[in-house]
Curated annotation (Swiss-Prot):
One of its GO terms (biological process) is aerobic respiration. The keyword Metal-binding does not apply. Core subunit of the mitochondrial membrane respiratory chain NADH dehydrogenase (Complex I) that is believed to belong to the minimal assembly required for catalysis. Complex I functions in the transfer of electrons from NADH to the respiratory chain. The immediate electron acceptor for the enzyme is believed to be ubiquinone. Its EC number is 7.1.1.2. GO terms for cellular component: mitochondrial inner membrane. It is a multi-pass membrane protein. It comes from Anopheles quadrimaculatus. Pfam families: NADHdh (PF00146). PANTHER family: NADH DEHYDROGENASE SUBUNIT 1 (PTHR11432), NADH-UBIQUINONE OXIDOREDUCTASE CHAIN 1 (PTHR11432:SF3). Its main location: mitochondrion. It comes from the Eukaryota. One of its GO terms (molecular function) is NADH dehydrogenase (ubiquinone) activity. This is NADH-ubiquinone oxidoreductase chain 1.
């Protein structure tokens, strides 16, 4: 019984902590963007604007929920809920030593969840019955599918090297040298692919304000918009965590792990404040003509390395 209840309590605590982390990540983003644009950012609610995320949450969830007249009601309603559910479930493959739900196929579970995330965006865009939302949804789907290929290949190359699908093994393999040092190009490709996966600047075509008003979530108000927002920032935090686990290998119980995670999340925000939006055709060329060959080359290199080491043994 204890074995059944403890993972449940652990996962519930994890979800609550992720939610609080997302709340303060939004505050950090607004503050950092404020200082980048030479202004203060939110500083009225609480001490130095510390309670701003909570007042935002109250405001969003108490506003009136509107439903477009010609929308597909059930799909429209469930898409944000499913989106948030997926981005929280994906945290279950976080490599805990207590084996929360950190099963041996954690990498495959991550790939499955990111692939499913495409459907929520597509359904949200389609069921709104708005041209802007549909265009945003289609862009997001094409973009996510393109960049998932390079993400999967990068993960596959490390799996060949490590020989295991469990994220926990990434620590033991990086006790002497971090992967970022001998796979620096792969690290950059991974970071850019993460930006594209989470629909962040400079790849935020799904919600290109200058072209599509707000993209696939244009018809969502109050609670629905808040859920989509939470899902997006939760996936940003998760991608930062994954970057730290794969490339900056550190023990999840050390304080340095959290410093690194905060730094990578800060890089996401920094990129948003610095870079303009990319051109859509160049985004696709980048995925298929630059990232794909690079990650394939590394994959062959790692396979060759593994075969070479095995041949030395026998």
């Amino acid at each position: 019984m204890f074995d059944k209840i403890m993972p449940l309590i652990g996962s519930l605590l994890l979800v609550i902590c992720v939610m609080v982390g997302v709340a303060f990540l939004t505050l950090l983003e607004r503050k950092v963007l404020g200082y980048i644009q030479i202004r203060k950012g939110p500083n009225k609610v609480g001490f130095n604007g510390l309670l701003q995320p909570f007042s935002d949450a109250v405001k969003l969830f108490t506003k009136e929920q509107t439903y477009p007249l010609l929308s597909n009601y059930i799909s429209y309603y469930f898409s944000p809920i499913f989106s948030l559910f997926l981005s929280l479930v994906i945290w279950m493959c976080i490599p805990y030593l207590i084996k929360l739900y950190s099963f041996n196929l954690g990498v495959l579970f991550f790939l499955c969840c990111t692939s499913l995330g495409v459907y929520t965006v597509m359904i949200a865009g389609w069921s709104s019955n708005s041209n802007y939302a549909l265009l945003g949804g289609l862009r997001a789907v094409a973009q996510t599918i393109s960049y998932e290929v390079s993400l999967a290949l990068i993960l596959l190359s490390f799996i060949f090297l490590i020989g295991n699908y469990n994220f926990l093994n990434f620590y033991s393999y990086q006790s002497y040298i971090w992967f970022i040092f001998f796979c620096f190009p792969l690290g950059l490709v991974w970071l850019a692919s993460c930006l594209a996966e989470t629909n962040r600047t400079p790849f935020d075509f799904a919600e290109g304000e200058s072209e599509l008003v707000s993209g696939f979530n244009v018809e969502y108000s109050s609670g629905g918009f808040a859920l989509i927002f939470l899902a997006e920032y939760s996936s940003i935090l998760f991608m930062s965590m994954l970057f730290v686990v794969i490339f900056l290998g550190s023990d999840i119980y050390s304080l340095m792990f959290f410093f690194k995670l905060t730094f990578i999340s800060f890089v996401f925000i920094w990129v948003r404040g610095t870079l303009p939006r990319f051109r859509y055709d160049k985004l696709m060329y980048l995925a298929w003509k630059s990232f794909l060959p690079l990650s394939l080359n590394y994959l062959f290199f790692f396979v060759g390395l593994k075969i070479f080491f095995i041949s030395l043994l026998f």
